[in-house]
Amino acid sequence: TQLTGFHHTRGMLCAMKRPKLRDPAALLQDASRVAVLENVMNPTNLGAIFRSAAALGMDAVLLTSAGSDPLYRRAVRVSMGTVFQVPWAYLPEDWTALLHTLGFRTAAMALQDDSVRLDDPRLAAERKLAVVMGTEGDGLADETIAACDFTVRIPMHHGVDSLNVAAASAVAFYALGKV
């Protein structure tokens, strides 16, 4: 517990070198469906998003620098190791311009008056699509929403207006991924 910060019940410990950070432009060359996470802070949510991305056909996960570290032990654990399977990279400040230059259309998951439903056929028809998810609580920045091609909402019942970012990502990846 002195080394890890918590009690191990299974007696296993592994020390690894961090992988070299990937270039997002190179990572996106052959991708058609990617997740963009803007400032997702909770490592549990981050791990769950990686697991959903792996299971539901996303080619990569792209992160802003202010979010949680995918290699944080809780994120790795919740992801069931998929942070080592799904390619990921940190994005530059002008990431929307990078995605657009590489031919991606961007879909901001946000509750706005002009939001289209997740099942809008235009979204699934896009050859290259980035699904953009925001931080817990605050969601996406207004500037991010304005820079995206689509604003998208998940239709819901019983007066519920939003889902946790990990749950919303699973729904969005299922609808828009390569399943």
Language model features with spans:
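N-terminal positively charged helical leader segments and presequences
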Residues: 1-4, 105
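Structured adenosyl-cofactor binding patch, chiefly the S-adenosyl-L-methionine
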Residues: 11-14, 52-56, 67-84, 142-179
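RNA substrate-binding interface of SAM-dependent RNA methyltransferases
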Residues: 16-114
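Active-site/ligand-binding-proximal alpha/beta "capping" segment
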Residues: 108-160
